[in-house]
C-alpha cells in the first residue's frame, strides 16, 4: 500500500484554529460502515445513535504544558517539546536548536530562563533532560510550560487553551497532545448519556509528539510506529466483556482509545481482552483485524496520516475516502479543534484492496 493512497485535497480554510464556543455544538458526520451511507448532523445526535447498555470508552489522559523555550548556557536558543516524563526529575524530549546540545550541556529554560536543566544523554532523535530543581517535573511544566498545540494550529498558545485543549474528564497527566475526539463531550451531554443507560469506561494512553510525525516512507508496511504508554485496567476489561456478552457495542472515543483496546486484545493470552499496562507501537492500517471496537467517534485527520489509515481499516478505504471528500465539499472543520465523525464497523473492510 502506498502512503499517497491516503492523500486528499484540503483547503487551508477548513483547518480549525479555535474550537466551537460550546464543546458539543460541533457538526457530526456519521458513516455507516457496512453501506458507506453518510448522514450530516450535530454532535449531540450521538444521544440517538447510542443504545442503553452500549459502552463508551474514553481516554482520560491529561495534556501537560509540554513546550518549553529557553537557551543553552553557551548561547543558542532552544525549544524543548516533552515526549514523556521519565520520573519526577527527568524528561525525554525533542529539542529544536541550531546546534543540538551535547551530553552535559546546561540549559536555561522558561521565558525568564529561571529553570536550570542538564542534557544528560541522547536516545536517537530524543534527548534525556534532568532538572536541577527541588520541584517535580510536572510542577515545573505547569509553571513555565506552554500548551503544545499541534503544528497545523498555526498560532501561539493562549491561556484559554489550557482548558480548551483538554477533555472535561482528563485525569492522568502525561500527554503532549489531546485525545481530540473527547474534546466534544461536555458535562450536560455526559449526563444525558448516563441517563439513557450508556455505560462508560476509561483507558489511559499518553499521546506522544510522534502522533504529529509525518509518515516518511512511500510504502505503508515500511513505517515504524512511534511508541506510547497505555493502560487498560481490569474494570475496563470487565466492562468490555460484559457489553459484548449482552449484545451491546463497544464504542471507542478517539483513535487513542482504539489503539489502547486493540493493543490489550492483541496481547491477551486467554480472553478476548485482558488488562494491559505497557508501551504500544500498534499500527492499524487496512487489512487489520479489529477484535474489540464496534463503533468509533473521531475527528477528521491529516492526509497521509496513520490515523486516516486506522479509520480506513475500520470503515473501509473507499467509504473513508468518500466520507472525507464529502466533508471537504460540505465544509466541515478539520483536525484537533474541528468537527467529528461517528463510524460503525465495516466487517468487509479487511478484504478490501487499496490502491488497485
Curated annotation (Swiss-Prot):
Disulfide bonds: none annotated. Keywords: Cytoplasm, Queuosine biosynthesis, S-adenosyl-L-methionine, Transferase. Pathway: tRNA modification; tRNA-queuosine biosynthesis. GO terms for cellular component: cytoplasm. Transmembrane segments: none annotated. It comes from the Bacteria. GO terms for molecular function: S-adenosylmethionine:tRNA ribosyltransferase-isomerase activity. Its EC number is 2.4.99.17. Pfam families: Queuosine_synth. One of its GO terms (biological process) is tRNA wobble guanine modification. It catalyses: 7-aminomethyl-7-carbaguanosine(34) in tRNA + S-adenosyl-L-methionine = epoxyqueuosine(34) in tRNA + adenine + L-methionine + 2 H(+). It is found in: Cytoplasm. Belongs to the QueA family. HAMAP family: QueA (MF_00113). Monomer. Transfers and isomerizes the ribose moiety from AdoMet to the 7-aminomethyl group of 7-deazaguanine (preQ1-tRNA) to give epoxyqueuosine (oQ-tRNA). This is S-adenosylmethionine:tRNA ribosyltransferase-isomerase.
